[in-house]
């Protein structure tokens, strides 16, 4: 078992199932619990009450590309969250435990002529590792002004560096 570059949604959605648990050793199961966020695939018959505490969750489409339709509970009202949960259950969407981000002042770049290019905005950050052949090959950072950092939510992609041995 090792952490890899794959998205957590497909892995996380099946990690708690009985078929997976039967295949893992105790050490492997502990590793998965530690490194993969709690994730559930929803069905129309799903009990949605466990997700009522909206600030603990994020909901995403179940397909491979999930920039459209992602909603963090922190970014919406309770009624909007409940509506999105019902829609997500109909569409078999994925619900994950929300991984809190930290915010830092960020230089935006690409400012308009009348804007101060040195002015910073507060942005939430999400880091990740590029893994190649089982080794760390670099670091990436994405940041945004909402709790969902996606292509259509004002995401800023930050530079990355590559580690050479």
State where each predicted segment sits.
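Active-site nucleotide/adenylate-binding loops and adjacent lid/helix of ATP-dependent enzymes
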Residues: 1-104, 108
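ATP-dependent carboxylate/phosphate-activation module, predominantly the ATP-grasp catalytic core
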Residues: 68-165
């Amino acid at each position: 078992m090792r952490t890899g570059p794959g998205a957590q949604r497909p892995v996380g959605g099946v990690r708690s199932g009985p078929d997976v648990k039967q295949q893992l050793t105790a050490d492997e199961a502990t590793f998965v619990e530690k490194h993969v966020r709690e994730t559930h695939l929803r069905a129309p018959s799903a009990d949605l009450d466990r997700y009522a505490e909206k600030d603990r969750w994020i909901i995403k489409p179940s397909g491979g590309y999930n920039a459209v339709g992602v909603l963090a509970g922190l970014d919406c009202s309770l009624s909007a969250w409940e509506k999105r949960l019902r829609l997500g259950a109909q569409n078999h969407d994925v619900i994950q435990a929300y991984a809190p981000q930290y915010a830092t002042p960020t230089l935006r770049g690409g400012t308009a002529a009348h804007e101060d290019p040195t002015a910073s905005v507060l942005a939430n950050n999400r880091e990740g590792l590029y893994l190649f052949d089982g080794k760390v090959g670099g670091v990436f950072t994405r940041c945004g002004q909402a709790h969902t950092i996606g292509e259509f939510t004002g995401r800023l992609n930050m530079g990355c560096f590559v580690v050479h041995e």
